[in-house]
Structures are given as structure tokens and as C-alpha cells.
Amino acid sequence: MTGKLKQISSSCCFGGYQNVMEHFSDVLNCKMKFGIYLPDCCVSKEPVSVPILFWLSGLTCTEENFIIKSGMQRFASKFKVIVVNPDTSPRGEDIPVGIDWDPNFGVAAGFYLDATEPKFAKNYKMYSYLVKEFVPLIFEEYKELIIKQSCGIFGHSMGGHGALTIGLKHPELFKSISVFAPICNPMKKTPNFGYKHLEAFLGPLEGENILQWEKYDSMTLASKYKGPKVEILFDQVGSKDPFLQDLLPNNLISVSNPNIVWNYQLRENYDHGYYFISTFIEEHFSFHTKFWGKEEKKK
């Protein structure tokens, strides 16, 4: 590695290592932490290159939640894949937070977009951070261990929104997409989250500003998608999800686009949390393997 990364912790897990790293982001103007799981084949005496998955977490999360709650390390080890998960927002004393309806607005709620409202525009650029800085940083720092052509993205809730919007805009980077209970149509007003977060970051949904909103609305992006044909695994919980009225999954899967195949799974009896994710995450790993090269490259 080049010295841009600082190791915060490292724990052996299923023969590999779950690391937490830190770096300074020039895009966000603050230090950022992320998790990275390296399976045993990447840390052996003769390491090999493997596929990579980028996970995006939901509202209120840090880089820690996914690491300690999802149980993903077992399956990253089984399927021989590196898993990387960034934080969900910029953080620090100099990072602006708060609006009239939420004094902590912004913390753990970056929505994977580039804010345009003056208060947030300098720091809240999670879209540019991920696409222009974080992914290239990971590819460079771990280049000897990664098969870049076998790269996927997945996420939950706000992170599912991020996985969809970023994945659909960048098929050249991400060859596979899967989501757990994503926010699907934030251009539509809902009671709790989505619309009002985009409004705080982007300004009113009117006039020429509509184009800014459309960049971060999965339903709009899916309807306009013209990239290579993509199958998306879409895991959605049923009536026990207290945020179903905010997620609007039916709005998204109603989009008919010949270049998108919705692999939609309705999981009744589960709620919106990590018990749901940990139950079905192995299926997501298995799904992504369909789109990867099968061989590992020896060093």
C-alpha cells in the first residue's frame, strides 16, 4: 500500500482478516473510515486476486454496523471475495449538520449524492467520493488482490438507494447489483425519509432542479437506463417493514425496461433490520458470482 491508509483495527475471521481503515478524503474534506474483509486466499503466503463487492449501509449507520451485524465474513470467505464498506456520511467537528426539522441532519445520512444547497455542498459529496475517490483508492491500494472486472455493489435501505443509483449510472464499474429493502423513489413525498432528505441536500423539486433530483431517483434512472442488460436482485420485506411507505418498492419494479431484469424476492415476516440481511446475505453473494470470472489469478 502507498501510505494513504491508516489501519485502525484488524481481526482474524474465518481465516481471513476484517480490517477497519482510515484515510483523508479530499472530496469530503475530512477523515473517513471503512471496513475491508480480505478472505484467507488474499492473506496467504501465495495470495491470489479475487472479485470485490462494495456494500453501502443505511441511515444511522457507520462503517461498523455491517461488519458486526451481517455475518458476511463467513460468505466472503466461502465465495472468496473482498468486501469493502465505506461510512455513510462525512464526519467531524467542521462538518455542518442540522436543519429545522432535525438538529442532527446529515450525520450518517449522506444519501450517496452530491449536495447542491450551500450549507452542505462543500462536504456532502458522497456520490463523487465513492465513484471518483473511494473506489479508485481501493483499486489502487489493493490492486494486487482485486479482479477489477469482477466488481459488484449492494446495499440496504439508503444504501440500497445508493447501490441502485450508482450501479445503474456506472455499469462500467459494477457488473452486478443487489439490494435489501432500498429507498426506490425519493422524488415522491413520503412520511419519514427520502424526499425531505433530497430536498434538504438539493433544494426544491421544481424547474431546472428537477434534473438534479432525477440523478438520485432509482425509478427515474431505471426507466431511462440504456446500458448493458443487467439483472438486479431485489430483496424486499413485507408488511412488517415499518418503513414500507417510504421505500415504495412497487414503484420501482413496475418500471419496464428491456435492459433490466428484476429478480424480486418478497420476504414476509421479516422487518427492516439486520436479522433480515443476515438471513439472506448468502443468497446475495451467490447471485453476484454469476457475473464474475471463475478463475483466480495467481500472483
Show where each model-derived region lies:
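Non-catalytic cap/lid and distal C-terminal segments of serine-dependent acyl enzymes
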Residues: 2-299
